[in-house]
Regions:
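Basic/polar N-terminal segments that are highly enriched at the extreme N-terminus
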Residues: 1-5
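Short, contiguous alpha-helical
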Residues: 8-12, 16-19, 29-77, 122-160
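Hydrophobic alpha-helical core bundles mediating ligand binding, dimerization, or RNAP-core interactions
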Residues: 11, 15-18, 22, 98, ...
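Acidic-glycine-rich active-site phosphate/pyrophosphate-binding loop
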Residues: 19-23, 116-120
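A structural signal for long alpha-helical coiled-coils and helix-turn connectors
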Residues: 26, 110-113, 151
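Acidic/histidine-rich alpha-helical segments that form the ligand environment
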Residues: 77-116, 131-136
C-alpha cells in the first residue's frame, strides 16, 4: 500500500462511520443538540462540508466544486446557535453537496504523488499536504462522536 491508498482508506472509513450515524435521522432529529451549547448535526454537516472545500482548496487550488450559492452564509459560527430548520439545508441537500465535495477531494487526492504529501501547507493543524488529506476522514469522525450521543438520546441502539 502506498501513501495515497492509506489516506483514501482513512477518508473512506470516516465517511462510512459518519454517514452511518446520520442515515436514519430525520431533518428534525438533525437539529437535536447533544448538550446545551453544543452544535446540532445539521450545522456540523454544513461546517464539515465547507471545511473540506476550504482545506482541499489550500492544497489543490481550484480542485473543489464550488459550494451552492448561499451555503457558506447558512453555516457560520453565528448560525450555529439557531434551531430554526428553515435557516439550514435539508439532510438530502446536505448529503448531495457532501458527495459532490467528496468526489472533488478524492479526485484531488488521486492527482498527488508520494512526494507531494510531504509538501508544507503553512497550516498549523495540518502542516503537510498528507496531513490535510488525512483531516478529511478524521475531522468527520471527530464530530461523529457527538452524533453517537445524539443517537442514544433519541433512543437509537449503538451502531459500532
Amino acid at each position: 500500500m502506498n501513501s495515497k491508498e492509506g489516506l483514501k482508506i482513512g477518508i473512506d472509513v470516516g465517511r462510512m462511520i459518519s454517514l452511518g450515524y446520520v442515515e436514519d435521522l430525520s431533518d428534525q432529529e438533525l437539529l437535536h443538540r447533544p448538550a446545551k451549547g453544543a452544535n446540532h448535526i445539521n450545522w456540523q454537516l454544513g461546517h464539515l462540508i465547507q471545511s473540506e472545500n476550504e482545506m482541499i482548496n489550500i492544497v489543490a487550488p481550484g480542485a473543489m466544486p464550488k459550494l451552492p450559492a448561499g451555503f457558506a452564509e447558512k453555516y457560520t459560527k453565528d448560525s450555529a446557535t439557531s434551531d430554526d430548520a428553515s435557516k439550514f439545508l435539508k439532510k438530502a441537500e446536505l448529503l448531495k453537496v457532501f458527495e459532490e465535495q467528496r468526489a472533488g477531494t478524492l479526485k484531488a487526492l488521486d492527482k498527488q504523488s508520494d512526494a507531494d504529501f510531504d509538501k508544507p501547507t503553512g497550516v498549523e493543524y495540518a502542516p503537510t499536504v498528507g496531513a490535510m488529506f488525512s483531516m478529511q476522514g478524521t475531522h468527520w469522525v471527530m464530530h461523529a462522536g457527538q452524533w453517537a450521543v445524539v443517537r442514544r438520546q433519541l433512543g437509537r441502539k449503538p451502531m459500532f
